[in-house]
A protein has these predicted regions:
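Non-heme Fe(II)/2-oxoglutarate
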Residues: 1-118
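Conserved metal-binding segment of the jelly-roll/cupin
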Residues: 174-190
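Asparagine-centered strand-capping/turn motif at beta-strand->loop junctions
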Residues: 191-196
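Short, conserved beta-strand element in jelly-roll/cupin
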Residues: 133-135, 148-163
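A short glycine-rich, His/Asp/Glu-containing loop-to-beta-strand
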Residues: 116-136
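A short beta-loop-beta micro-motif enriched in histidine and acidic residues
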Residues: 125, 139-153, 169
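A short beta-strand-loop-beta hairpin characteristic of the jelly-roll/cupin
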Residues: 157-177
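A short hydrophobic beta-strand segment most commonly corresponding to one strand
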Residues: 152-158, 181-183, 197-215
């Protein structure tokens, strides 16, 4: 099933039109915008791999029964309730983020380069920040994260093995590569398949976005899309 879905989705292609006045608007047709970073992602990857057996936990394991299926999806939280709580605070009985008391978690001491980079993004407030691992051969079946436009989660590729793809059903492949951060509209149907022999590591940042970072990503997408 995942093979057929990807075959159809990869036939689709999105090209950016005029720069939107407000990329968060419900009628905006941009599924993503991206920016490329000049940072030591090889060093970050080494830090992250060192956490392997000790800290990564299965992410959204209950969704295999109650929602969409996935295989080989693991995570560790860098900013949140604690390193093992990888889902939204309401899954753990909290009514607000303030009650959940998000903090930079204990694993951050093992990831100095990674955390320094994340703090340099200039968010005025960090919400959940997680490393998401998709095992070699792993996949996340087609789904949406909710109704309407859900633009803003920032997905940064620490690595992105050849053969590992994130696709939108109606917009085709998202051009991830090592060192590229992508703001995504997760209200659109999407799926991920790591059809490679290498584990994939991305970081997802939620929070109050640095406006300059977002605007730079929009301009960068408009100027470079289809060229790299």
């Amino acid at each position: 099933m995942i093979q057929e879905y990807f075959k159809k989705s990869l036939e689709k292609k999105w090209e950016p039109n005029d720069i939107p006045e407000n990329i968060f608007n419900q009628d905006c047709d941009w599924p993503y915008s991206y920016i490329d970073f000049d940072a030591d992602f090889d060093k970050m990857l080494k830090e992250i791999i060192s956490l392997e057996e000790t800290y990564f936990v299965k992410h959204r394991d209950k969704d295999k029964l109650n929602s969409y299926f996935h295989e080989g999806w693991n995570a560790v939280t860098l900013h949140g309730i604690d390193s093992t709580k990888t889902e939204h605070f309401d899954r753990y009985g909290f009514k607000t983020q303030e009650d959940a008391n998000y903090v930079w978690t204990d694993v951050c001491e093992y990831l100095p380069t990674t955390v320094e980079f994340l703090k340099s993004l200039g968010y005025s407030q960090y919400d959940r920040v997680r490393i998401m691992k998709l095992n070699a051969g792993g996949y996340i079946m087609p789904h949406t994260d909710g109704k309407g436009r859900i633009f803003g989660p920032f997905n940064i590729a620490i690595n992105n093995p050849e053969g590992c793809n994130f696709v939108f059903k109606e917009n085709g492949i998202v051009p991830f590569k090592k060192g590229r951060g992508v703001f995504l509209d997760l209200g659109r149907e999407h799926a991920v398949w790591n059809n490679s022999n290498e584990d994939r590591y991305h970081i997802i940042v939620h929070g109050h976005i640095n406006p300059k970072l977002l605007n730079d990503s929009i301009s960068h997408t408009k100027n470079t899309h289809g060229h790299n």
